[in-house]
Design a protein with these regions (language model features):
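Extreme N-terminal tail/first-helix region
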Residues: 1-13
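Hydrophobic (often cysteine-bearing) scaffold residues that line and stabilize catalytic clefts
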Residues: 15, 93, 140
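Short, contiguous alpha-helical
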Residues: 9-10, 20, 30-77, 119-157
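Conserved catalytic core of Hanks-type protein kinase domains
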Residues: 25, 45-48, 107-110
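Hydrophobic alpha-helical core bundles mediating ligand binding, dimerization, or RNAP-core interactions
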Residues: 12, 16-19, 23, 97, ...
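Generic structural signal for secondary-structure transition and capping sites
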Residues: 17, 28-31, 54, 102, ...
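Acidic/histidine-rich alpha-helical segments that form the ligand environment
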Residues: 78-116, 132-137
Length: 157
């Protein structure tokens, strides 16, 4: 594994741990609440990050995802929360948030993700390698980290 991917792993791990710390004291009502002017909630953002990581790093690169994508499809791009997510489901999402990333880090270290099928984003930007996918994922997670910080502040008021 090259140094760049080690840095990406370190950055994404930091973001994910920070999100879990930031949201651990919030209850299921707070995690499900969609503030006025927003289109999604905290639990949707966390689930969306899981779904997107699997799409970018596995599915779109021609690899089999490591999670139940049928469950996480409710967090796909262009979706919005439609049902109240129970405490049991929140525990599952939070566990998968950690486990799926740690599996990704393991797959990188073991060389499983060296071959990657090229594909293009709707913007026309081409993702040619797994390293490109990791960079794109890190940017995406940083964006949602900012949203989660804002939503968590609103829930704390």
């Amino acid at each position: 594994m090259n140094t760049k991917l080690k840095k990406e792993i370190e950055l994404i791990r930091y973001v994910r741990h920070s999100i879990l710390d930031l949201t651990k004291q919030l209850n299921e009502v707070q995690l499900n609440h969609i503030p006025t002017g927003m289109k999604n909630n905290l639990v949707w953002n966390i689930g969306h990050m899981v779904f997107t990581q699997q799409m970018l790093c596995y599915t779109l690169g021609g690899l089999k995802p490591t999670i139940d994508m049928s469950y996480f499809a409710q967090f796909a791009p262009e979706t919005t929360p439609s049902d109240f997510v129970t405490q049991q489901e929140i525990k599952k999402i939070r566990a998968t948030f950690t486990d799926a990333f740690e599996r990704l880090a393991f797959d990188i270290a073991s060389g499983k993700l060296e071959s990657y099928k090229s594909w293009s984003l709707p913007s026309g930007i081409t993702i040619d390698s797994f390293q490109d996918a990791m960079i794109t994922n890190a940017i995406h997670e940083g964006r949602h980290f900012g949203v989660i910080i804002s939503l968590a502040k609103l829930m704390s008021q």
